[in-house]
Amino acid sequence: MLLQKEREEIVAYGKKMISSGLTKGTGGNISIFNREQGLVAISPSGLEYYETKPEDVVILNLDGEVIEGERKPSSELDMHLIYYRKREDINALVHTHSPYAKTIASLGWELPAVSYLIAFAGPNVRCAPYETFGTKQLADAAFEGMIDRRAVLLANHGLIAGANNIKMAFTVAEEIEFCAQIYYQTKSIGEPKLLPEDEMENLAKKFEGYGQQ
C-alpha cells in the first residue's frame, strides 16, 4: 500500500482524538501530506475511528484525485488540500469537534491570549465565519483565518490545527482545546487578563522550534 506509515498514523491519531475527547462519533478528520511523493493520506468519511484500518485511509493527489483506496475520503477534503497547496510549513492537519473550542466558535469569538499556550497556534486563534461543512467556501474561510497561524476556530463547527508533522498538529489541537476551556472558565468568573501582543509574538517564535526534532 502507498503511504503505509501515514495510514497507520492516521488510524492511531483518530483513536487518540476520540480518547482525548477532541471529537465524538465520526466527527472530525485527519490528514497527512507526503510532500516528497506529492500524495495526501486522509481519513475516510463516516467511518468510526476505532473501526478504521490502514487500508481504509484514502490516498489522493493535490488535485483531489483518488490514487489508492476504496473508501470515500473525508467530506472536508477541500479544507485539507488548500493548506497543502498553499502552506509549505504544513504537512499534517487535525480537524476536531472539541467541546470548548466549539463553544467559543459557536459564539463567533476569537480565542485571545488567555494563556501562553495559545502561542502553539500564534498570537491568538481567529474564528472563521460560518460556512456549510464540506464546501469550498468553508475551505477558503478556514485558510484565510489560519493564513499565518497553526489553528483556526470554525464558527458553529469546530477547530482545525496544522503543523509540519502529525504529532505536532495533534498537540496544537489539544493545547488550543485546553486554552478554550481556560477561556470559558475565566469568562464565567470575570474578565481574563490577557498577555500583551509583543509577548505573544515572541512566544509564537519560540514555539516554532518546540519539542524533539
Swiss-Prot record:
The active site is at 76 (proton donor/acceptor). Catalyzes the cleavage of 5-deoxy-D-ribulose 1-phosphate to yield dihydroxyacetone phosphate (DHAP) and acetaldehyde, as part of a 5-deoxyribose salvage pathway that recycles this toxic radical SAM enzyme by-product to mainstream metabolites. Is also able to catalyze the reverse reaction, using several aldehydes as substrate, with acetaldehyde being the preferred substrate. This is 5-deoxy-D-ribulose 1-phosphate aldolase. It is an enzyme of class 4 (lyase). Pathway: Carbohydrate degradation. Belongs to the aldolase class II family. Mn(2+) binds at residues 76, 95, 97, 157. Disruption phenotype: Cells lacking this gene show no impaired growth on minimal medium but addition of 5-deoxyribose inhibits growth at a higher level than wild-type. It comes from the Bacteria. Keywords: Lyase, Manganese, Metal-binding. Transmembrane segments: none annotated. Its cofactor is Mn(2+). GO terms for biological process: carbohydrate metabolic process; pentose catabolic process; toxic metabolite repair. One of its GO terms (molecular function) is manganese ion binding. It comes from Bacillus thuringiensis serovar kurstaki (strain ATCC 35866 / NRRL B-4488 / HD73). Substrate binds at residues 28-29, 45-46, 74-76. Pfam families: Aldolase_II (PF00596). The keyword rRNA-binding does not apply. Its EC number is 4.1.2.-. InterPro entries: Aldolase_class_II_sugar_metab, Aldolase_II/adducin_N, Aldolase_II/adducin_N_sf. It catalyses: 5-deoxy-D-ribulose 1-phosphate = dihydroxyacetone phosphate + acetaldehyde. The keyword Cytoplasm does not apply. NCBIfam families: PRK06833.1. The gene is drdA. Signal peptide: none annotated. GO terms for cellular component: cytosol.
